[in-house]
Amino acid sequence: MVFKPLTIAAAIAGLTPFVSAFDAQAKSNVAVYYGQGYGQQRLSHFCQETSLDIINIGFINTFPDQGAAGWPGSNFGNQCDGLTYEVDGVSTKLLSGCHQIAEDIPICQAAGKKVLLSLGGASPDNQQILSDASAVRFADFLWGAFGPQTEEWVSNDGPRPFGEVVVDGFDFDIEHNGGFGYATMVNRFRELFALVPERTFYISGAPQCPIPDPQLSDAIAQSPFDFVWVQFYNTAGCAASDSINGVSTGFNFDDWVDVIKRGANPDAKLYVGLPAGPGAAGAGYYLTPEEVYPLVDVYMNLYPETFGGIMLWEATASDENTFSGLTFADVIKDILVAVDPSPPVPSPSSSSVIASSTPVASSTPVASSAPASSTPISSGSPVPSSSAVSSSPAVSSTTESSSTQVVSGSVSASSSPITSSPVASSTPVASSAPSATSSAVASSSPIAPSSPVASSSAIASSSAIASSSAIASSSAIASSSAIASSSAIASSSAIASSSAIASSSAIASSSAIASSSAIASSSAIASSSAIASSSPVAPSSPVASSSPAVSSSAIVSSTPAVSTPVASSIPVISSPAIASGSAIASSSHVASSSTPAASSSPAVSSSPVASSSPALSSSPSASASSTPIIPSSTASSAVVSSSPTPSSSVVRSSSLLSSSSPALSSTRTPSNPVIPSSSAISITPSSTPVRSTSSVAPGKSSSAPVIPKPSSTVIATFTSSSGSLPSSSAPAGSGVPSSSTLPHPSSTSLLSSSPVSSAEPVSSSSAVGTSVGSSSNVVTGVSTRSSSSVVPSGTPIPPVSGTATESVTSSSSGSGSPTVPSSINTSSTDASSSSSASSVEPTSSGSVITSVTSSSASRVSSSSSSVVITNPSVPSDSSSSSGSELSTTSSTESTSSASSQTGAPTTSVSLGSSEAASTSTSGAAASGSGAQDSTKPTDHASTLSPSYSTPLASASGQTGSPTTVPAGIPTGNGSGLAPITSSITSAQAVPSVTSSGLESEPEPTITTTVIVTSYIDICPEGFTTITTTYTTTYCPATVSATATATAAVTNPPGAPAQTTSPSVPEGWTTTVTVCTHCAPTPTTVTLTLPATNRPSALASSTSAPNSPEDWTTTVSVCTDCGPTPTTVTVTIPVGAATGVDALTASPSGSQPAGESSPGQSAPTAPASTAPTTTETVIVVPSQSSTSQPVILGTGSVRASSTFHIQPSQSGSRVPVAPSGTAAGVSPVFTGAASRVSRLQHGAGAVSAFALFLLAAI
């Protein structure tokens, strides 16, 4: 069995929680059993809980001495598909298809949890070891099957039910037939553990509370156990409930301490085993949290060296037993931590400073020093300065109760770097000496917040600037300041400079940064004024800091700095949610341009041009750190005020740039991303002082939330332009402000307009929309440089917006009113100004490329999105030049090809998972007609969908009819039907002509039709996505047909993609086997496409004129879905057309779900008189970690060779459906909850699936 390493790595990257190192010696650990809960969720769901430290997966419930063929058997409830191994024709009880568990165990381990495999359970009751030799063989078998994989085991075809996944040890929950052999097994395990000294493995046991326990007392005395969690329930006279009921001879924890001290390992930790809910044990044995607290308080303090924590039976019972939104395990963890006088300090993630391997040398020294003073500058001449600050401190997360020092590294990447170090004080930092360094500077300072930081240090200068000289400010602050806090930091600081330039680097971070080592923004774009903004964030309690960070120099820039990407050899992931808002104002009181959380002071800016440009670091992969920051709900509001202020100074802003050219990286390592929780950035235009408040929703009291809901962050830019000057300039003393206000506070979402660095007045600013969909969004934003590029009124601007659960699509029209679906998240606001600047000349086209890469987070499907937007410059008459180039930036290997013709800006979006955002507008159509809305809002709570980047998206821009082709199949794990995408696109805009007459072509015409169909089955355990490509090739003249069904889908790992090639004279039939984990017998769907007669136009193929010439195009796809790549060969003749017959089909573009149904032909490319190129889009998603792999085709169901063990060469072993198991689902039993009524499964899951499948067909 070979599980895809990229799939597991992506899932781990998306679900890395607030990791603290596991401490086996802690007194506050929580252990829980998993695998036997009724209707239990996937293991990954419980990995999200920070309260859980140890998870026992149960059970290996059949022992070799009682098992078929001498093999053990397993039962993990609803988490396996029912297939078992077969030995020499004998079906064993060892499950072979437990893909979900195999996918989820590494995620739990990456979250700092230990996963043990439990032996025993309450059923069956014949479990027994008959000899020491049998005990040794049993231990060796389990070590080979579930321990580290060895070549010897694989070469002998040994079973690996979990693939290459390795458990962290073994648990003994022995309920029957005495204790013989278990000490031998434990000692044998210890010998095997010693073979892998680089990894720690554990042994645990769950005896019942009577002393001595008939099953495990001997093993505890004779072999070393690490943990002993006694079942203090279901047995009267020793249960924990006896201590509550006042039974003097009851709760015998003291006696068990003596058993431990006399055992083979006197240092073993003793846990109190409790039921996790009223129904998890017999009546009267459940303890409420109020009853647990005094018990823990007494015994933890009485036996601090032996008390280890609490064991719970079982995970699903805890999950369903909630208290104000907290599970029972959460509450128990809170109790343990509260009582524990010295809880273990979590180990922070790697805090190494990663400097760029290609430092940018300084080319222009700083011509003047900027003293750290708040004195306003009154001068008649500008102060020349040319510096750019790229501050990127790398931080890592700390818990609420610790103050771990975090090393931050800043890399200067500009024409004249100035290192801005974050300091833990209120002293502003500024450069006071010329700097011409060419080395990357890594500064470090401790950032140790130990409580939620609600810093609302919006610093405003109260001194006016009496400057009468023209000041051209071009400040670009490439700040990706990461705040290390266990909860969200509402705001870094909004700083208003008291100098003539109010370029105040307002870093309104709406979510904390989850990067143990950040790389500075790859380029400082045309930044000529550096604000050494160093507002410290080092509070140990809630802080309302008001320390000024003031730059008091008037800055004039004459030479823009050349932006040079910093190629980092060690890529990291920085936060996608840093909105670096720079306010450019003239001489007036300048308040905070970004009002952070809890700030209610009015934001009054004298400059109506206040662009909020996100400072986003682009890095496609993460460093190998292991500690993310999981903030609580955070919101920050950037308030843009346009209240005019009389001023005699002229301010020309050349535009703030998103200082995030792609930080090129050549390696990809496991990431530890940020998982923002409900972060939202709203930018509100206003013509009066605005009171902005932000709500900070803290996480639960026990610890930071691990897997929050997907957040939605849309950052827009407000551009005001009514005259030749962007500022509110007016004759001195006139008191009459110019009319450069924000006329359309909520118009079309403006992605970008080209910035200007020339001396001409301009009202243009750039903003890069960012889509925060999951844990580690990497947004690359590049604004091309041109002169005086202003988008006139009425020109549709393609917006980019996206959320993880809801999509935001805005189709712009001439009226400037946005089109927003009803499912838009209220925390996501798309707004921009669509006013025109009458005195600005149109310039050459500029393109903005935004690449969005989303890793997966729990319950957040991941995707690799490549968004390519061409925004040609348009003169005032809304016409655009043709031939605009499209370029694509994608952190993963996603390909987009498009052809943009006159007046047709084309958007090609390659989307997967639950993110969907695409909009096409026609530049030539003033009313925006022809825009095609293909956004599919998906609100599925999916479980760990891996990141995939296989879609090939092809879009053709036709005259007046733009086309949007989203390629990819969203996945989800909800109760609704996930979108099903079928798409076929062509690159020609020739109308199709449907012919109903007979075709008289003497030469046969070959047509290739590709149907992309996705079937999704929904079961309580998860869902499976199957995408099968059917290709049929036939000659209309002979009406003969052959068909091949290429099963490039999610197969069981290691199993080759199966292909069936029926050849039927009258048609073809393909059989698909799906959802083997919902029923013992595979469900068969038969799709029949009969051969069509030529008189029938509806089923006819596209006919092209005969020609001896032809050409062939070969497309290879899905190299990671099977052992060999799938090749599709398309052969199309070329010649002069005499007639065109077309299939009846939907227009080129996105085909809604369910339209590619049996008996309906897929659309094909229309032909033309010129040589026609038909591009076939084959959408083949990689295996989703949320789905149960399925075998397609008519071949026999067979796993890879690693599924089987062959003691002799004569037997063949194939996984078969178990016999005697109702509905193909393993029976549910209570396991460690001994002698309690067993839970039973029904056939509801199978019925639901069958009904759904029939409806889908």
UniProtKB/Swiss-Prot annotation:
Family the entry assigns: Belongs to the glycosyl hydrolase 18 family. Chitinase class III subfamily.
Protein name stated in the entry: Endochitinase A
Active site: E175 (proton donor)
Membrane topology reported for the UniProt record: Lipid-anchor; GPI-anchor
Subcellular location field: Cell membrane; Secreted, Cell wall
Biased composition (Polar residues): 700-715, 940-964, 1145-1154
Organism domain of life: Eukaryota
